[in-house]
Amino acid sequence: RYPGAFEPMDAAYDDQGRPQAYLIYALLVCATKDGRWLQFAQVSPKLIGAWLTELDLLGELADPKWQGFPMLPTPELRTEWWDMMIERVGARTLAEWQHAMTENLDLSGELFRTPEDSLNHPQTAHEGRATTVIDPDLGPVRQPSTLIHADGKPLTQLRPAPRVGEHNDSVAFDQVGGAALPAPQGDHHDPPLKGVAVLEFGSMFAGPYGATLLADLGARVIKVEPLEGDNIRNLVAFPEAGGAKVLQGKESVAIDFTKPAGLDLVYELAKRSDIVLQCFRGKAAERAKIDEASLRAVNPDLAFVTTSGYGVDGPFAHRAAYAPSVGAASGLARVDSHDTGQPPTDLDDLHRRAVKLHAGGAVPAVQSDGIAAHGVGSALLVALYAKRRGKMLTNVVTTMLGTVQQAMIAYNASYASRPAETPADEQFFGMNALYRMYRAADGYVFLAAPLPREWPALAKAMSPYADLHADERFADADSRTAHDEELIAALTPVFAAKTKLEWENELCAQDVGCVEVVEANSELVLQSDPYYEAGYAVDAHSPIFDEHRRLAPLCRFSRSRTRADAGCTIGQHTDAVLSEIGLDEAAIADLRVREIVGGG
């Protein structure tokens, strides 16, 4: 509907390392007085106000110079404000900042940890989300516990990985525990979750997108929003664009449930729901009387999943969590930034390191919000499945931090004989000569032939351009490892001689893994015409954006279809949903006048 009205920013910093995106200030990366790196998390209006107050910068906004903050017009002004914040943070030690975050509940920040050290996080220790498994070959293995916790402990006791065929004699493959499931009624086209009603309380992305995944599978998801709407709707400069993805397929009901009449409406919705997703910090849901106990009092058959950044209790439960802060706490940012977390030597060095650490926690395709949301979707399905099998789970909890630690298990699991990780090179081209990017004539290709059995095909394919077979430095896997830099040097001019698609076509035809590198956001690529025609993207109709493309649902089924709807406006479905629970037009109008409901 609005072509050209909004162009997403490619990077948070410009080519000179100066801030471009206003969220840099809310999500400040900075070093303390004693050289420890912190990732702050102050995105909502309330939190950014608390942040500027803590830094004693709120009064500065009275100066006309800063008009329009945080969207300052020039790189010079943006950098000047950035440096003011850096100076204020750098005036305190890590211990002083940790004390401030304990005293000020609207202040949140995380130390940039390694993946292994992430399992020492105070909240991880409090919840028991790190455990030790005794492996018969490796000995004690320290690793994350289960993705889902129930009743304050891991959903199941972790066991060592089984040996091949270890349980062949002990498993009766024709027996299934629990209640028998109904047999499929032939071919049909209903979505797999048709008839499931999800009631969602949450904001932003990491929790709510878990319910979006269920909407794609056919669940009816009713999102209860405050009258002013979820903050994510206005997170980017173009109104509603920030929430377009997370609101897909949902019905929005705007209710002020801080008022008794609004809370009564919530209880009526709970009576008609199968499962609730609650995404509030700490004990906020309990204070609002929409916690598990309160809602099960009106519907005992209600499945319930609680998710937040850090859990329902413990030292960090009250803190806000956003993708960058959880990326710092989990070790994700350190792995993807190559920064060792060393103290900065001067302001220029601080700028450079801050940009790298930010980039490590903000890779669009793999960042903490998306990882956590898939954990939430999994927990919702587990809770629904358990309910269907006649076992109602209670106090089902996932956390952003715990879920991202699960995704980092290849990096955070530790045991005595664990080999050292092979890091990517400094420029992030790849891991070694046979698993990395190379510059082609018109861009880059990625070569993926790291296994010894793949070498003969690669050497043969390259024989018109370089005689790799005859070079003793590359005779076997050990030699190639010892002469990795020389192998890179041998292949670099070869790849530079042809275009990326020429290399992809030529090498793939000879069973050598090689693809062109597309230098664009993966979601934009997957919505381009070739991928749209292949089914990776579909058309949806939004009340805000009209017809547009969106990514297709993640799953496809042999007998069931999925849904791929667009988002909704604030309270778009308020009237329709309230009518379903028995309210007439006059009653709804009265609630709107009293500012108990909105939208419609």
Identify the role of each PLM range.
Residues 95-97, 133-134, 159, 163-392, ...:
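N-terminal helix-loop segment corresponding to the beta1-alpha1 unit
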Residues 12-16, 31-33, 84, 113-200, ...:
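Terminal low-complexity tails and localization/encapsulation signals of metabolic enzymes
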Residues 1-43, 49-53, 149, 217, ...:
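Active-site-adjacent "lid/gating" segments in soluble enzymes
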Residues 109, 252-254, 304, 395-397, ...:
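Conserved beta-strand scaffold positions in the cores of enzyme catalytic domains, especially
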Residues 103-109, 219-222, 272, 300-302, ...:
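Alpha-to-beta junction loops
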